[in-house]
């Protein structure tokens, strides 16, 4: 992991009082001078670990169009009175939208499953609608994008709402049944699951402020809903964990963290209001997950909920802003909230306050489970504020990782402009602009900024040479290509891809030849793998030249009968610093081998000496610029090593690394690799 954050040098233009009038330290409201922040590590791909989850997020009702649920019924009487209607028409433009996600370069996509489509009436199951989500998952995986599925994101069937929804505990089983059936359908391919999105927002907006369906103002009903949502989450988590694939899936709750700061920090009434709202909106929910006892907002006592304690494998954090509190805060959402004089007001009227994301992490750290930023974005119609908003929040996230917070990923809200609940279409959060008349999507400048940061941290395409005959392995490669020979229970190709994915690779190109038809059914659960077969043996160089149309501008080159578990980040750093056309990994301890190097550059290559077991000098992992293939390639049979290495003497860079290089080219070496992998697994 190579992370470079210089947050210790940041200066603060404002830092308010540490404590309220009674002298008890509560929290610091930090305000940073962002003009002093160094964003270079972000831009250069040095701010986040290689396995960091880069994502974008959406919700079904906001983008799909054509839904009939509690929200579509509520919309005519909502504050904006705008109807979701066709929304972004994602239901009919799914494949194109997956292409938009791919173009951003992200590794993950969070979406929600529309319960009302799949169970439009009690006891009815729409398999065609369920299959639509299964097809979405397959399309995402084919592009190397890992799905994260949310089972409840504000919407629910009208028939269930009419029965009282989450107000009645006896209704919970309907949602759990829906969840388990969708889990059974998708969990063989979907690793990440969110049970309920923002239960505090659902409860507050629907049952306290009346801005969401059912549009009531009742603390009593809100308490029932809050309690039953936590019971539903616990029941759902335990049910899913008991199912096939349950133990290998990561299942968690998504909590919106809304910070509350006293408007006047010397005023005890302002502090009282901040503490009260923080307790009701944040602390009671987090404490419930930690202890298993939940005290709903405005309740006097807590109640033990079976299965609640430890019912999240991760905590999803949705963070947008902080609110400044007074005893007379308005309860109408459309009234502008208070802001500090130096803060920027977003289109949603609240301030941009990136510094608060760190406090959100601190608030959930005590759960002792991984943290994922499942939503972070800004309403900004002109896209003037969003680029800086992205940089600031990613900077805060990177600093927290450096300081020891276990933060696994960041999902930008949202992929595209969409139907923003009570605000209708007046608030735009997307990286893609949507013309709601034509449904045309256009990448915004902020989308380019996010994509640039993501791609700077992304690993290049992995290219695997798997076309050789493997004759040294004898009988076993007469009927099985060498890259599909099983080692420790799975093909060596799978081991190679597993390691590459752990290093941050998303896409692989496998060059096949001998028995190439046997690769047709091969799939990897986390990487998009494509195959290119040579009609006749072309040698290592000829195979690359033959596949030149499928090579990306830069790629990592490995051999399909070797396992070389090096740190790709360190190899890439050497390559980028040297600005070389090719950088190869070489062990540090060697003298008179086929490959000689001096001062970090390849000196000569002469394939005459007998290769020493497991040295890997001729075929070590390399990073290659596609231009090398285009400038030196030719038709016919030729060797990459013997041709290119010699021609790049004095130009190719050397990356020194003593990581063992496992060559399974002979039965004896295969046995050594088998033993190594068994020991690694144990």
Where does each model-flagged region fall?
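Catalytic domains of carbohydrate-active enzymes, especially glycoside hydrolases
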Residues: 93-114, 310, 314
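A short, conserved acidic/glycine-rich loop-to-beta-strand motif
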Residues: 578-588
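Conserved N-terminal catalytic core of the sugar/cofactor nucleotidyltransferase
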Residues: 459-464, 486, 490-570, 633, ...
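N-terminal nucleotide-binding beta1-loop-alpha1 segment
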Residues: 459-478
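Active-site metal-binding loops of divalent metal-dependent hydrolases
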Residues: 199, 376, 469, 561-562
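Catalytic-core segments of class I nucleotidyltransferases/pyrophosphorylases
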Residues: 555-556, 563, 569-576, 589-591, ...
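Active-site region of glycoside hydrolase catalytic domains
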Residues: 2-78, 102, 122, 131-386, ...
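Aromatic- and Gly/Pro-rich amphipathic surface segment
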Residues: 72-100, 104
């Amino acid at each position: 992991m190579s992370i470079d954050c210089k947050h210790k040098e940041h200066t603060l233009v404002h830092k308010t009082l540490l404590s309220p009038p009674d002298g008890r330290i509560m929290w610091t409201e930090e305000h940073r001078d962002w003009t002093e922040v160094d964003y270079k590590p972000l831009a250069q791909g040095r701010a986040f670990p290689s396995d960091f989850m880069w994502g974008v997020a959406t919700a079904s009702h906001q983008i799909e169009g054509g839904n009939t649920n509690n929200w579509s019924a509520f919309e005519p009487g909502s504050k904006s009175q705008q109807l979701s209607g066709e929304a972004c028409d994602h239901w009919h433009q799914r494949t194109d939208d997956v292409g938009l996600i791919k173009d951003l370069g992200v590794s993950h996509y969070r979406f929600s499953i529309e319960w009302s489509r799949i169970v439009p009436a009690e006891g009815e199951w729409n398999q065609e609608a369920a299959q639509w989500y299964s097809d979405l998952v397959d399309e995402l995986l084919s592009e190397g994008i890992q799905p994260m599925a949310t089972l409840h994101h504000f919407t629910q069937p009208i028939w269930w709402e009419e029965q009282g929804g989450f107000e009645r505990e006896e209704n919970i089983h309907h949602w759990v049944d829906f969840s388990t059936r969708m889990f059974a359908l998708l969990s063989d391919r979907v690793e990440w699951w969110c049970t309920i999105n923002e239960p505090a927002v659902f409860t507050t907006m629907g049952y306290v402020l009346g801005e969401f369906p059912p549009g009531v103002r009742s603390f009593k009903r809100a308490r029932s809903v809050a309690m039953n949502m936590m019971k539903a989450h616990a029941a759902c988590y335990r049910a899913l964990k008991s199912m096939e694939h349950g133990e290998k899936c990561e299942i968690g709750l998504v909590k919106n963290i809304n910070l509350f700061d006293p408007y006047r920090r010397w005023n005890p009434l302002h502090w009282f209001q901040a503490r009260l709202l923080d307790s009701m909106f944040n602390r009671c929910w987090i404490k419930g997950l930690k202890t298993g006892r939940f005290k709903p907002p405005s309740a006097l006592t807590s109640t033990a909920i079976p299965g609640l304690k430890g019912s999240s494998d991760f905590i999803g954090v949705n963070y947008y802003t902080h609110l400044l509190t007074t005893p007379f805060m308005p309860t109408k959402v459309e009234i502008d909230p208070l802001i500090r004089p130096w803060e920027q007001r977003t289109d949603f009227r609240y301030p941009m306050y990136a510094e608060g994301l760190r406090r959100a992490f601190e608030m959930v750290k005590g759960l002792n489970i991984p943290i994922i930023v499942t939503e972070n974005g800004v309403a900004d119609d002109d896209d003037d504020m969003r680029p800086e908003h992205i940089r600031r929040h990613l900077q805060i996230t990177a600093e927290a990782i450096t300081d020891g917070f276990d933060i696994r990923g960041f999902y930008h809200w949202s992929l595209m402009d969409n139907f923003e609940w009570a605000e209708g279409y007046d608030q735009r959060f997307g990286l893609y602009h949507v013309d709601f008349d034509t449904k045309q999507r256009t990448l915004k400048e902020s989308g380019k900024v996010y994509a640039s940061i993501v791609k700077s941290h992304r690993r290049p395409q992995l290219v695997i040479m798997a076309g050789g005959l493997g004759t040294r392995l004898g009988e076993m490669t007469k009927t099985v290509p060498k890259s599909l020979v099983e080692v420790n229970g799975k093909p060596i190709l799978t081991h190679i891809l597993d390691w590459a994915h752990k290093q941050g690779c998303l896409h692989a190109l496998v060059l096949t030849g001998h028995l190439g038809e046997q690769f047709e059914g091969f799939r990897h659960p986390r990487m998009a793998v494509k195959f290119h077969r040579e009609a006749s043996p072309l040698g290592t160089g000829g195979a690359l030249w033959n596949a030149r149309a499928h090579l990306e501008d830069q790629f990592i080159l490995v051999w399909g009968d070797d396992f070389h578990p090096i740190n790709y980040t360190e190899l890439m750093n050497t390559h980028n610093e040297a600005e070389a056309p090719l950088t190869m990994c070489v062990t540090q301890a060697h003298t008179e081998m086929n490959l000689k190097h001096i001062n970090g550059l390849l000196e000569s290559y002469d394939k005459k000496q007998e290769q020493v077991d497991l040295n890997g000098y001729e075929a070590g992992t390399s990073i290659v610029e596609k231009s090398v293939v285009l400038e030196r390639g030719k038709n016919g049979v030729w060797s990459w090593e013997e041709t290119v290495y010699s021609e790049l003497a004095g130009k190719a860079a050397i990356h020194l690394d003593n990581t063992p290089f496992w060559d399974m080219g002979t039965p004896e070496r295969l046995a050594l690799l088998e033993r190594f992998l068994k020991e690694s697994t144990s």
